[in-house]
Amino acid sequence: MTDSADTPQVELSEQGLNAAADAAEKAFAEAANLEELAAARREHLGDDAPIPAARRSLGSLPKDQRKDAGRLVNMARGRVEKRFAQVKAELERKRNEEVLRAERIDVTEPTTRGQRGAQHPITILSEQIADIFVGMGWEIADGPEVEAEYFNFDSLNFIPDHPARTLQDTFHIAPEGSGQVLRTHTSPVQMRTMLSRDLPIYIACPGRVFRTDELDATHTPVFHQVEGLAVDKGLTMAHLKGTLDHLAKTLFGEEAKTRIRPNYFPFTEPSAEVDVWFADKKGGAGWIEWGGCGMVNPNVLIAAGVDPEEYSGFAFGMGIERTLQFRNGLPDMRDMVEGDVRFTLPFGVRR
């Protein structure tokens, strides 16, 4: 506690209290900012300041003098408090004006050109492929990512114990037995389209799919596919091959070509793998496996309510990430999902 000898004394008279108030008002007027004003207030209205000290000394006066002396103390303190509030309001107004001036934006001032963002390379390639099919007169179709097992497997001629149905290959939606999965391909979109549209059908189905793969240089559990489906009268493998050739030449250059090799898929018969030949960016050229294709299995057409004696169809599908990977000579698929700007800068960002 501060010793009473250290406390500034003020005469308990109108003249003495006015002098203390004058000193406080002078200190407030000299404050250049709110911090200095707060310091001046502590000096003149704090516990050890003259006017508060005078209030505490009222008890030492004779009773008949306390009322008048108390009135004088209150008048002095009220005068000082009023002046403090006025000065504080003025300093706050000046501070706010300074802040507004500092934050003012000159809309006529030329701006520096910054780096512009753009779409991810996977999105760019997906849209390029979609544009190719739209240019051929095809439609773009989409469907749910959480899919019924019926559309993902049963309607596409997968037998009940097919390995693709297991937990080792497919994400099943809880609870067990719900009959729902994260779609493993975009083929369910083809079945949904055949059930909901009139024939003929020519659709491309780009989209995200899910499989229980570990993320490594050539695999990712979440990736993108584009699948195509055509159902019409008189379609053959020749129409399929011509479509694949057009897609390859548009994506990889006029020198690109495709070949098909026999394979097996439940939803096509006959089925084939499709390879693409093109000149890469390093000056080399060669064949590389691209995707799967074939004529739509009659069982799939029947499940969609299509008469296989009157209509035929072909289908194909390939991975977007894989296409981007070998088209652009990318050694590691993980670069596509890790969001590293050093990867996206050459593809999805333009200055």
From Swiss-Prot:
Query: Which GO molecular function terms does the record list?
Result: ATP binding; magnesium ion binding; phenylalanine-tRNA ligase activity; tRNA binding
The ranges of region (Disordered) come to 45-69
InterPro entries membership: aa-tRNA-synth_II, aa-tRNA-synth_II/BPL/LPL, Phe-tRNA-synth_IIc_asu, Phe-tRNA_ligase_II_N, Phe_tRNA_ligase_alpha1_bac, Phenylalanyl-tRNA_Synthase, tRNA-bd_arm
Its main localization is cytoplasm
Documented EC number(s): 6.1.1.20
Has the keyword Ribonucleoprotein been applied to this entry?
no
**Which coenzymes or cofactors are required?**
Mg(2+)
Please list the residues that bind Mg(2+): 269
The family line of this record is:
Belongs to the class-II aminoacyl-tRNA synthetase family. Phe-tRNA synthetase alpha subunit type 1 subfamily.
Its protein name is: Phenylalanine--tRNA ligase alpha subunit
Q: Which organism is it from?
A: Corynebacterium jeikeium (strain K411)
User: What is the gene called?
Assistant: pheS
